[in-house]
Amino acid sequence: MKHLAALIAGLLLTAGCGPKAITVGSRPFPAARPVFSDASGKALEALPAADGTIRLVFLEFPWCPACADVWRAVGISAKPFPQGTVRVYRVLFDRETVLTPDGRKEVPPLRPAPLPEGDGPEDPLALKVTTLTALPVEFREEFRVSQGPVVLLLDAEGTVERRWIGFSAGMSRELSSEIMKRARVLSPRPPGT
């Protein structure tokens, strides 16, 4: 009995160790250490400022067949709202796991990630997209993400309010509904901005 109690105590002490799951109600960013890099290569532990917009975090993985569908759903859901209502943090992973005769290996993506649709300067309804790259070792040691793609809806303080894993046919409708709820709370922008 004494050994069982010691085992349970040991398991409870180590239960908080290791990568955390990004769950609804958690506040993953800022992380304890840098887990992203921006376009300039600067390491970041937090998402860049979002100027009061509705924030979505899109964890996009290499060889992700559903990622194009998720991008389409995000674009469709944000289209009815004024430009700048939604900011998407696109987090790319620059490593993928491949199976080789020697076992599993982490390698750079075998093909580059395509740019999301509707992210061009010529598109007047373009989403505000900030692209970041996950630092492979640091992100994996800080967070546990077992499958993707993942879309997180954050509140103003950075707490995860909703999480979607994978793609579903009703995703754009769900996202649009969540944006609508939050867009009512946002103060109207002054004319001409």
Descriptions of predicted regions:
Residues 125, 135-176:
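Thiol/disulfide oxidoreductase modules built on the thioredoxin-like
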Residues 48-68:
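Short active-site neighborhood of thiol/selenol oxidoreductases, capturing the structured segment around
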Residues 17-47:
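N-terminal "domain-start" segment that seeds a small globular fold
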Residues 5-15:
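Bacterial N-terminal signal peptides
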Residues 1-3:
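Positively charged n-region of N-terminal signal peptides that target proteins for export
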Residues 68-123, 136-140:
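Structural microenvironment flanking redox-active thiols in thiol-disulfide oxidoreductases
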Residues 32, 54-55, 148-150:
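Short loop/turn microsegments at loop-to-beta-strand junctions
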Residues 190-193:
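Short, solvent-exposed mixed-charge patches
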